[in-house]
């Protein structure tokens, strides 16, 4: 009887921890979506002006964004109070840079990609939490494949192959789907291994990881669905 009570309390604690992480992910995605909306509609003329006349603003934002990822991750793993604000600043800036990608696609394509991303994210999250299979090996394989995708993407910048871009996008969907599942399993295992003694910084770190999984999944699906846009 006591064992059942302990299990129930642990299960409730794990659910609360997942809820905390997913609220942060939702906050980040929502903030990115809001900033993208502002750039795509109220400030659309500014967006077009930057694309045509001042592209260095976009590239500068992309570089700052890349730096912020490492800063936010480092702050989160050190459990510093600045981790959450940095994560939110990154999410807002990412919304800005995303708008320059989204503007090239039809509105229906964007909604289709977003809803599909949400469905895949939800399904893979459940798989990651429920599966008994150790996914740490898969996680390593996904990161190795991700490096290959980055290299292939850089090469394709010079080649400009539409087919290669499509293949890269399909592989990216598989990679980030796998990472969503493995990240969720890791959250569960770390929580259980530490008996729930995990800091808020670690929650931010995992929220950042899941946020990146979702955004990259969305971009990959957007490119697949928008091939004819």
Curated annotation (Swiss-Prot):
Q: What is its main location?
A: membrane
Location(s), subcellular: Cell membrane
- What are the TM regions of this chain, as residue ranges? 21-41, 56-76, 83-103, 109-129, 141-161, 162-182, 202-222
Q: Which cysteines are joined by disulfide bonds?
A: none
Give the record's membrane topology.
Answer: Multi-pass membrane protein
Superkingdom, according to UniProt?
Bacteria
Q: Which GO terms describe its cellular component?
A: plasma membrane
**Which Pfam families would you find in this protein's record?**
Bax1-I
Q: Which UniProt keywords apply?
A: Cell membrane, Membrane, Transmembrane, Transmembrane helix
Q: Where is the signal peptide?
A: none
The similarity comment for this entry is: Belongs to the BI1 family.
Q: What is this protein called?
A: Uncharacterized membrane protein SpyM3_0260
Origin species? Streptococcus pyogenes serotype M3 (strain ATCC BAA-595 / MGAS315)
């Amino acid at each position: 009887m006591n064992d059942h009570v302990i299990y129930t309390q642990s299960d409730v604690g794990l659910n609360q921890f997942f809820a905390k992480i997913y609220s942060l992910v939702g906050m980040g995605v929502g903030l990115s979506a809001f900033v993208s909306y502002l750039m795509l509609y109220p400030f659309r003329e500014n967006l077009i002006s930057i694309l045509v006349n001042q592209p260095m603003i976009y590239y500068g934002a992309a570089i700052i964004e890349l730096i912020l990822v490492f800063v936010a991750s480092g702050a989160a793993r050190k459990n510093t109070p600045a981790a959450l604000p940095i994560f939110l600043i990154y999410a807002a800036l990412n919304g800005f840079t995303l708008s320059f990608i989204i503007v090239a696609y039809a509105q229906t394509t964007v909604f289709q990609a977003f809803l599909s991303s949400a469905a895949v994210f939800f399904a893979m999250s459940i798989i990651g939490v429920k599966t008994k299979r150790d996914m740490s090996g898969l996680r390593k394989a996904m990161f190795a494949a991700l490096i290959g995708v980055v290299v292939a993407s850089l090469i394709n910048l010079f080649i400009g192959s539409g087919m290669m871009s499509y293949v890269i996008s399909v592989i990216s969907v598989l990679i980030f789907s796998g990472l969503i599942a493995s990240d969720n399993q890791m959250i569960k295992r770390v929580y259980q291994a530490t008996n729930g003694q995990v800091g808020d910084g670690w929650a931010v770190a995992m929220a950042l990881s899941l946020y990146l999984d979702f955004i990259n999944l969305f971009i990959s699906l957007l490119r697949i669905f928008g091939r004819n846009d």
